[in-house]
Design a protein with these regions (language model features):
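Catalytic, metal-anchored helix/loop core of enzyme active sites in primary metabolism
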Residues: 1-382
Length: 382
């Protein structure tokens, strides 16, 4: 019986992870944490009966304690509670399904506690990859990617020598606005941006997919996960979301991982790695598929990819600025405070204004995040 902990259990990745647990009889959920969706969290606790549960707000924790008073479960709150869940003693693997930089500290502490990490939280490696990867190696911990693209690359390089990789080809669907030109994006709405053609995801990542910032974040994440240079990573558009990513080797051979757009596959692969398990889901019908389309992204219109390359080449604290500015801008867009194209303007403005911190510590990273939020707030409150 494998014991797991999940932070972000009520979100898209968290709920699909629990679907995997439901379908298999050999995983026990020892610890759960969520934001403030207490109603769903209560349902999860009643079904999976973890030993410890975390919720962000102490008020929500009190509410949960009353609702679950018949259970002998420890209920914790805040960042310390999140860390306690992430490091729970009996859990062997932590699924980081939480969105945002809030996931960094729990991940660091879980690595120190010897937990393998099923990583779905992009921000952890984007902002702190230079800390996370050496720490994981020193602690003998595996970082197992859950993102479909990074899982695809991870599967393609299994059994290969890392120094034989020529380049990684990360695929993008193109998002809700594939084929749009800049003038067509001037008046798109939140509702338009949230209509992803292939994937069912959370609101923030769906907007990131529409801006292609998501691919930019994945470029930075891939650099750390697979120890490659930015010039060895290329983004291509694969609008059917059938090819999840590819690896070209030094002899010109290319391996690709194909499958239907279903996040359960990479989640399950991370949970059972290196074993493969049967998964009940749709399979590809090559006879009906027709042509597989591969195209180049319009990086002039969708600037998110180029911002990411600039951030990773600059290094230091710049990836944190890129990430934090995007987080804040997407939040503002979802609240209908700004237009879609202003997301790019905010990211660029912050990156241009920032004074680089070389080799930032965790404290530097969080202070940089705070600087970004304050800079944006001052700009819009002038």
């Amino acid at each position: 019986m494998k014991n797991i902990a999940i932070i972000g259990s009520t979100g898209s990745i968290g709920t699909q992870t629990l679907d995997i647990v439901r379908a298999n009889g050999d995983i026990r959920v020892s610890a759960l944490a969520a934001g403030n969706n207490v109603a769903l969290l209560e349902q999860q606790v009643r079904e999976f009966k973890p030993d410890i549960v975390g919720v962000w707000s102490e008020d929500k924790a009190k509410e949960l304690r009353v609702a679950l008073s018949e259970f002998d479960i420890r209920i914790v709150s805040g960042m310390e509670g999140l860390i306690e869940v992430a490091c729970y003693e009996s859990a062997e693997i932590l699924v980081t399904a939480i969105v945002g930089m809030i996931g960094i500290r729990p991940t660091v502490e879980a690595i120190k506690a010897g937990k393998d990490i099923a990583l779905a939280n992009k921000e952890t490696l984007v902002t702190a990859g230079h800390i996370i990867m050496p720490l994981a190696e020193a602690c003998g911990v595996k970082i197992l990617p859950v993102d479909s693209e990074h899982s695809a690359i991870f599967q393609c390089i299994h059994g290969e020598e890392e120094n034989r990789i020529r380049r990684l080809l990360i695929t993008a669907s193109g998002g809700a606005f594939r084929g749009y030109k800049r003038e067509e994006l001037e008046h798109v709405t939140v509702e338009d941006a949230l209509r992803h053609p292939n994937w069912s995801m959370g609101r923030k990542i769906t907007v990131d997919s529409a801006t292609l910032v998501n691919k930019g974040l994945e470029v930075i994440e891939a650099k750390w996960l697979f120890d490659v240079k930015p010039d060895q990573i290329e983004v291509v558009v694969q609008p059917q979301s059938i090819i999840h990513s590819m690896v070209e080797f030094c002899d010109g051979a290319v391996k690709a991982q194909l499958g239907t757009p279903d996040m359960k596959l990479p989640i399950q692969y991370a949970l059972y790695y290196p074993e493969r398990r049967k998964l009940t889901s749709d399979t590809l019908d090559f006879a009906k598929m027709g042509n597989i389309i591969i195209d180049t992204p319009d990086r002039e219109t969708f600037k998110g990819i180029d911002f990411a390359y600039s951030a990773i080449r600059t290094g230091g604290s710049m990836p944190t600025v890129f990430n934090a500015a995007n987080e804040k801008a997407v939040e503002m867009f979802l609240h209908k405070d700004i237009q879609f194209l202003q997301i790019y303007d905010i990211i660029e403005m912050c990156m241009e204004a920032h004074k680089i911190i070389e080799n930032p510590t965790l404290t530097d990273i969080f202070e940089t995040e705070q600087w970004v939020y304050e800079y944006i707030e001052k700009y819009f409150n002038r």
